[in-house]
Amino acid sequence: MCVSQDQLPQQLRYELKTAGIPLEAVSLYAVNLEKNQLLLDVNSKEPRNPASVMKLVTTLSALEILGPNFHWKTEISYRGQLKESTLFGDLIVKGFGDPSLTLEQFWILLNKIRSRGIQKIKGNVIIDRSFFDIPYHNPSEFDGKPFRPYNLGPDAFLVNFNSIKVTIVPDKKNKNIKIYSMPTFKNIKIKNKLKWSMRSCWSWPDTPKLVKENVVFEGLYSSKCGVKQRYYSMLSPDLYTAEIFKKIWKQLGGSIEGQILNGIKNSSDSFLLDHRSFPLTHILRTLNKHSNNVTARHIFLTLAYEQNNGKSVSTEKARAKISTWLKSIGLSPSEIIVENGSGLSRISRISAYQIGMILQRAWDSPLMPEFISSLPIIATDGTMRMRMRNTDLKGMGHMKTGYLKGTRTIAGFLKNKKKETLLVVCFINHPKAKNSWPIHKKLLTWLYERT
């Protein structure tokens, strides 16, 4: 039997009242997929901000449009003459939006170039980022936190998510705080003004400030917080790429006499090699397990790749492609707003019912295993790793979460006590939404135990 608004379980009503969230701000939709039985339907057709649950739309559209074995490429060419181990001219690197070009993969790419016999580059290294035809992205615009990687914009030649790993270590012997970063850059000076504290670790100063040319960490850091690691995007993509390129190229025994510059690959340039990314299915795990926004943006833009025959893609072209896809699966594009594919948006809108239809299509698809395996497992990994760890629900579901100011969402698949698979969606849009995890927890528990 479907539970309507008037029949909502008392436990859920209690959690809503405790959180100060009216039922009008909540959308619920749940289906027993094996019995084809509607379990919950409350405000399910109300368009709401889905936050990162929008990544489910990006995920399924990518699997169906690009295919599970889609690979991004990075193309290496040169202009001038290659004699013995010396390139008398420019090395050209054209990016096509590979979102998996980590430090390790970038090292492999540069090592491939070295293995083709190039050691000395007498000209410049030209980086062609033109495949993404997008305007300048301001990383401060969304919430004023430009160093946080979730605010990073797409880049057709993105290296290592443009990130620096910062490790904060309390030194109990000397009662001070140490900071380490990797990789290191001469252009970035991290200034440590953190002070030792013995207070409870309910929060820690994880948002540095830019003071002149220094990135400053300041405030009280509790020794009870232990070692903390966080990633930051502190350099422009152009500068980050240039510094990493020079550092690794030198480690490989190479040299560059010119500069590392942005430019355009010419049709007359001589092809050297292609570097292929991990397959889409591998990258989707990074996207959903860790809710990686820039990966979502890259996948979203790449949806327009095939229809443009390898020409540059844009946000407008990607939106047109996803609108066509939504229409093809029976959803109305006019009722859904997909701004950038990541869910990091104030204007994105979709209903719980429509997300339910996306999940239903994924469940019915031959690509169902690839889709579901990309989602975080309850109390096991990704954004669900710390959720419901000491409950019977551990490992019993794959759930995508969403988090923005005024928004908390969750959607995915849950096994109930009878080992039947349930489709679950819960959207909460309200100023007090930050208090809503107990609501999600109670919903999942009730569905697990009572349905």
What is each PLM-predicted segment?
Residues C2-P47, N111-R116:
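Beta-lactamase-like hydrolase cores
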Residues R13-L16, I65-P333, E449-R450:
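Conserved serine DD-peptidase/penicillin-binding transpeptidase domain
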Residues L28-A30, T74-I76, A411:
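Short beta-strand scaffold segments in enzyme catalytic cores
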Residues N36, K55-A62, V125, F157, ...:
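Residue-level preference for non-acidic, small/hydrophobic
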Residues L38-D41, H290, F300-T451:
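Small-residue-rich helix-loop
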Residues D41-S61, I65:
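Short active-site loop at a secondary-structure junction
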Residues V42-R48, Y231-Y232, S342-S345:
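A short glycine/serine-rich beta->alpha loop
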Residues E46, G97-P99, I428-K432:
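A generic structural motif
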